[in-house]
Amino acid sequence: MKKGLWVGLLMTIMLPIKAQKAVIEESVTDIVCDGPTHVIAHYKEIVTVLNPQGASLANFACSCSNKDKLTSFKGQVTDANGRIIRKLKESELQKYELSKHLAVDDYTMFLDYTPPVYPVTITYEWTIDSRDDLITFPRFCPQTDYNVSVKKASYRLKAPKSMTILHAQQNIANEVNIDKSSKYTQLLTLEANDLPILEKKTYSHPLREKMPMALFAPADFTYYDTQGSQRSWKDFGLWQYNLIQGLDILPENVRQQLHQLTDTMKTDREKVEALYRHLGKTTRYVAILLGIGGWKPATATSVYKSGFGDCKGLTNYMRAMLKEVGIASNYTLISTTNHRFMKDYTCAGQMNHAILQVPLPKDTLWLECTNPRLPMGYVHEDIAGHDAIEISEQGGRLVRLPIYADSTNLMRSTVNIHLSQDGTANLKVSQETFNRQYENRIPMAKMNEKERQKILPRIVYAPLTEIKSIDFSENGAKITMETEIKSQKYANQTGQRLFVPICPLHHGYTVPNDAAEREEDIWLEMGYLNEDDITLTIPNGYTIEACPKNISIEQPFASFSFSLHRDDKTIHIKNRLLMRSGMFAKSLFPSLAEFLQSINNIYNQRIILKKI
């Protein structure tokens, strides 16, 4: 059963709210496996939706294919008194193909239901019959959203006694019970009852790491006409390596073109970069998760002919092109959502993406083949620091991708402010963003002029602004924004004084107010460094009456400094904020709130200029 097969209520993650929005009254997953290639899974979900915030939990969705068929479905809706409002039939389901472009037969069966009243209870029952692609069993994941409690959830897996079943779990108190008293079958069961709601807290781990979940997989499996093992990453990698053999054949005209492109280049790195650019110019990505459409990539020839592919196909195509010019590379499986694979569980169902590893003499490159717009070898935020499985002739090997140091996720800003006597100001801003902050700036760099002008006020806080120019340039993992603006009321004028903001770049930070209730440790997923260099030219006829004092704050999770230097005509300000990624004790949460409030206080201060 494929990694990408997900069934059940479509639980879209909502914006955080304190009120509970739904109750999972009962969740039943009942699986019968009668051999290495056949599984029947029966599901029952009863959910009470309490208010409109939980409306999306009333929807139904399951992914299917020619090998994973929905064989039965029924549902009903009842009101608070138990009266049946409506029966839901299989004929109401809508079918959505996952891709019209790729040679996959996967599709989604979907029912979009909006409750007429609240509270309302929805019951769904359905069965999936799966054949020939049993790499993992359906997972047990009874709680997949914030502010939803669970009364009763159960998982039952019946399989041949001769089959070795591997399993792993997180955030579930009960252990898997294994009953082998029957002569021919074994029964694995697991329950999770009376689960309180998961609340979204600031500076805490993401939902995926808090959810109760258990994974199950056969140690040895049959996938179509292949056999494989998941007893170790090495074994799993050997199966995946054999699966992709013979898929790297390129047409003769393509081979000649690649040699014309690279034969005169002196280094392998130059060749990799040339082919990476070629990939970006000649192909297009179609978003299909690993496991959906199978584990086998499309052939390099088919990707060349069609001009598009999913992560598997594009990665294999790049691998084939590198092989043609004599450069070895390794197909690599990774998760874009989970940083770590489950401990001692060396099975599929934990990765959803394919990338390419290129080991060079002095460096190892990681190529994101679905987005060649990124600089070659740039490790983006969805994979940086994540576990991955490198696939080679020797089998699979657990590796961990590099992650950029906090201080290299840099935003460096230079601001020149020419202030007039009436409080108007001309501002010239040059802002360089690197690595993770570079990624955050990519969407704006791709916008047209009109769209950029709508976004700029969120970056430069200057009232009544006239944008004179805004330009972007890109060099590797660096985007530079240059803008010139005029603010009609940059400084507030009161009598003989001008009250001037000390920094037009930062509007302040949201200060958490739940420090007293903190139960979780602090988790800062992304560290970064902001450096501001601001020069304010004082208008003629004014002198400095008051300025904020220099300050420096040091905490385990961050550091901040503000310094101001002055002379007769100019004020020079420097801000430096370093946020450190990682886990910090919950006892530091009041200090974090105080730290953020201190920064806000500094940014909200004013320089006071007095008319001479």
Feature map (PLM): residue ranges:
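Bacterial Sec-dependent N-terminal signal peptides
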Residues: M1-K21
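A sensor for short, sequence-defined functional sites
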Residues: Q20-I612
